[in-house]
């Protein structure tokens, strides 16, 4: 090893401040299969060299501090330090670059997303030498991912539980999201499920407010589920939001949901926290509950291109922490999401092995080994005219969730659900017959309108609705 990067006790203690790059920039380093690898988009302050900025990120997110300390001599920092092992420019950006950092596995507690994030993104993002910093991607080695349970059940087990195959699942978020009484809320759930949906959903901020306490909502929703199941012969569910102010209260709500015999509960995993989410995921596996995950607050973290954390990192974290569904954008609706980038992290959620593909924002090959997959949920500003595109983009292993696109139907909730189910079945049949939904999708919907008045009414009311804005999240 070069003397410039030597940090063992034999060197002796020399007080003072030295450049991070002397210790933490190691371009000759060969990454190990057990290393956790990170790709950071770094924007240094003027005058800070890329090598120093990249090394500072590696140092401050692992063993380093701002000055040399004598206790460095009590351990082998070469074993534990993060290393900036490569730097590459960002096309079209003179002041930005990608710094690749390798972290030894021993830096992280097994089975703890909380500890992983506390180390890698917990402190370094406030570092003064950097104008901005964004974590673009992580490579989680099998040696670490195998310490996590992961999703409570996964895609195949969910399909077996629901006895539903060969198509996306259909959902609906009950609106208005706040203000309904528990009984009226349950009525809306029943009407949507009776009309043909597989799931209905609590909105992310429905917890236990004065107008509708959680226990009342759970009871009326369970009644709606059982009534709809009896009338349709299909298994139904409602995402009962167990998110609460304390972990103990969250678990109380999940336990009550299990006692009611419902199939699925819900958690806001970012506002609720990874420790709470992992605890709930373990309970759900042990007790046969599916777990729907909402990503409320994600855009605070991932919306800006130069600072924060890309959603693909949050998606990987969720797969480790545990969830059977997670919201993933729509590409075509009202919420942010560019197609190639979105499909990149959708594959990271669903597939076992994902190759590095920079055209889709995937910086590292990811091998999940045997960890179950997560169903991506497309939700936000979508309606029946979007059904062909959603079916083509997301494929069968997804949940397509229409809130206003169900409850906004001019004839009511049940006809809105009928319209969505008919549109989905028509698109799946057309695809299975070999038709190109990307090119013929509108024609498929128009043909289905001829024998479904509910779909025809929905198509008429939403024919002019579009959400066309420039996408922020580009490569």
UniProtKB/Swiss-Prot annotation:
Keyword Zinc belongs to the record: no
Annotated binding of substrate, by residue: 123, 173, 177, 295, 327, 379
One family name in Pfam for this protein: RuBisCO_large_N
Cell compartment(s), UniProt: Plastid, Chloroplast
PTM annotation: The disulfide bond which can form in the large chain dimeric partners within the hexadecamer appears to be associated with oxidative stress and protein turnover.
Propeptide: 1-2
A Gene Ontology BP annotation from the UniProt entry: reductive pentose-phosphate cycle
Protein name: Ribulose bisphosphate carboxylase large chain
Encoding gene per record: rbcL
């Amino acid at each position: 090893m070069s003397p410039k990067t030597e940090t063992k006790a034999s060197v002796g203690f020399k007080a003072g401040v030295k450049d991070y790059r002397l210790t933490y920039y190691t371009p000759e380093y060969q990454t190990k299969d057990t290393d956790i690898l990170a790709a950071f988009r770094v924007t240094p302050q003027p005058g800070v060299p890329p090598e120093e900025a990249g090394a500072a990120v590696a140092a401050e997110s692992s063993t380093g501090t701002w000055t040399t300390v004598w206790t460095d001599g009590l351990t082998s920092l070469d074993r534990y330090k993060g290393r900036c092992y490569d730097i590459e420019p960002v096309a079209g950006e003179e002041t930005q670059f990608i710094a690749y950092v390798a972290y030894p596995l021993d830096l992280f507690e097994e089975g703890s997303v909380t500890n992983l994030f506390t180390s890698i993104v917990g402190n370094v993002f406030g570092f003064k030498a950097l104008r901005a910093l964004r974590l673009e991607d992580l490579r989680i080695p099998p040696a670490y991912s195998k310490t996590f349970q992961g999703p409570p059940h996964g895609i195949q087990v969910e399909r077996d539980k629901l006895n539903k195959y060969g198509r996306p699942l259909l959902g609906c978020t009950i609106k208005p999201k706040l203000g309904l009484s528990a009984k009226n809320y349950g009525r809306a759930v029943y009407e949507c499920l009776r009309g043909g949906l597989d799931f209905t959903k609590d909105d992310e901020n429905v917890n236990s407010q004065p107008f509708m306490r959680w226990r009342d909502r759970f009871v009326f929703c369970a009644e709606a589920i059982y009534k709809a199941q009896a009338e349709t012969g299909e298994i139904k569910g409602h995402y009962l939001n167990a998110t609460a102010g304390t972990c103990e209260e969250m678990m109380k709500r999940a336990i009550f949901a299990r006692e009611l015999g419902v199939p699925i509960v819900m958690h806001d995993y970012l506002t609720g926290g990874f420790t709470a989410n992992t605890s709930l995921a373990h309970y759900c596996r042990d007790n046969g509950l599916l777990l729907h995950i909402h990503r409320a607050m994600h855009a605070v973290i991932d919306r800006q291109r130069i600072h924060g954390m890309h959603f693909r990192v949050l998606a990987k974290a969720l797969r480790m922490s545990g969830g059977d569904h997670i919201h993933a954008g729509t590409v075509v609706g009202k919420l942010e999401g560019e197609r190639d980038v979105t499909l990149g992290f959708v594959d990271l959620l669903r597939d076992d092995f994902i190759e590095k593909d920079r055209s889709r924002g995937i910086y590292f090959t990811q091998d999940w080994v045997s960890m179950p997959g997560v169903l991506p949920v497309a939700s936000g500003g979508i309606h029946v005219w979007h059904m062909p595109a959603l079916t083509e983009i997301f494929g069968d292993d997804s949940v397509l969730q229409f809130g206003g696109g169900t409850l906004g139907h001019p004839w009511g909730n049940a006809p809105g659900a009928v319209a969505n189910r008919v549109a989905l079945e028509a698109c799946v049949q057309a695809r299975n017959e070999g038709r190109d939904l990307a090119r013929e999708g509108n024609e498929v919907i128009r043909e289905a309108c001829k024998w479904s008045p509910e779909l025809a009414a929905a198509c008429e009311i939403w024919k002019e609705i579009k959400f066309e804005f420039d996408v922020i999240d580009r490569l």
